[in-house]
């Protein structure tokens, strides 16, 4: 009898916990690696969405002491642990207001993430995919033909996608342009990608001219828009993660997709300017911590 009471009490506590969890502030699942030094992936995404009053729930794909641009780093592939890790969230009946995916290192990881989205996706949340595949016309070493095909399957579940030009052309099986891409070309490519599933697309980091970078925005069945930013310094690790997390946070807090991209571009530009002025090495990433208050003010 005493045992039965204890079991009943535990079930009651569990039920209360689940009820309270569902009442809490918005939650986003961040599926990405955890890197100790270098300001990238979950290490930048979690504090950014937290500053925007959103609870970050992490799903690690790998653990690194520093990102791969450093001459030495510790790496622990988390693929074989991901399903057991995710099972806890299923047993707790967690619900997410958004799901964000970043760099995925293998076909198996893409399969696991696709299954995660299928399980947790509903008509009240959205999925944002940053298809980290390559840049400047070259794919990363892990992205062979089979891996690219897996990523194309994942894109079908995205509501928002944030490719650069290399990733956009790869997802559409098009050659990387050997000229400055035109607005008409971008329109055609975005329409073609939207036909695969995404409602909102922003093609990031387009080298528009010698002094500006363009972010080309497409909302399905609506007009195209552009957000311009000054070209400052070189490429910095984690920039795409910062952009994706600011867009996700803004969009979760009720801002339009255009306003979300505009804020992300302005925030990144401000962080880059600080880094350049203070001679922060590019592989140390963005000093995003300096301007988190700018994001708090948007909530």
Feature map (PLM): residue ranges:
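Conserved N-terminal subdomain of the carbohydrate kinase-like
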Residues: 20-129, 133-141, 293
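Short pre-catalytic strand/loop immediately N-terminal to key active-site residues, enriched for Gly-Thr
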Residues: 36, 224-238
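Conserved phosphate/ATP/ADP-binding segment of small-molecule kinases
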Residues: 142-224
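Short, small-residue alpha-helix embedded
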Residues: 170, 234-257, 261
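Short, charged, surface-exposed loops that flank catalytic or proteolytic processing sites
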Residues: 176-185, 252-262
């Amino acid at each position: 009898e005493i045992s039965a009471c204890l079991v009943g009490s535990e079930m009651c506590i569990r039920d209360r916990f689940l009820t309270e969890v569902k009442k809490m502030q918005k939650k986003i699942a961040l599926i990405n690696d955890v890197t100790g030094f270098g300001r990238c992936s979950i290490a930048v995404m979690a504090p950014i969405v937290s500053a925007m009053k959103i609870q970050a729930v992490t799903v690690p794909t790998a653990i690194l002491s520093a990102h791969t641009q450093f001459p030495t780093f510790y790496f622990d592939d988390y693929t074989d642990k991901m399903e057991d890790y995710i099972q806890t969230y299923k047993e707790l009946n967690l619900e997410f207001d958004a799901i964000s995916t970043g760099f995925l290192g293998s076909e198996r990881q893409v399969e696991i993430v696709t299954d995660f989205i299928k399980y947790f996706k509903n008509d009240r949340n959205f999925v944002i995919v940053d298809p980290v595949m390559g840049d400047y016309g070259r794919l990363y070493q892990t992205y062979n033909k089979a891996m690219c095909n897996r990523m194309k399957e994942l894109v079908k579940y995205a509501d928002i996608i944030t490719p650069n030009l290399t990733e956009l052309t790869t997802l559409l099986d098009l050659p990387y342009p050997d000229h400055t891409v035109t607005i008409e070309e971008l329109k055609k490519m975005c329409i073609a990608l939207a036909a695969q599933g995404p409602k909102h697309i922003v093609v990031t980091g387009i080298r528009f001219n010698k002094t500006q970078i363009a972010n080309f925005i497409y909302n399905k069945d609506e007009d195209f828009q552009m957000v311009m930013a000054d070209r400052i310094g070189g490429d910095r690790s984690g920039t795409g993660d910062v952009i994706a997390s600011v867009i996700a946070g803004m969009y979760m807090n009720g801002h339009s997709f255009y306003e979300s991209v505009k804020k992300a571009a302005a925030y990144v530009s401000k962080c880059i300017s600080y880094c350049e002025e203070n001679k922060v090495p590019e592989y140390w990433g963005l000093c995003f911590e300096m301007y988190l208050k700018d994001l708090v003010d948007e909530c």
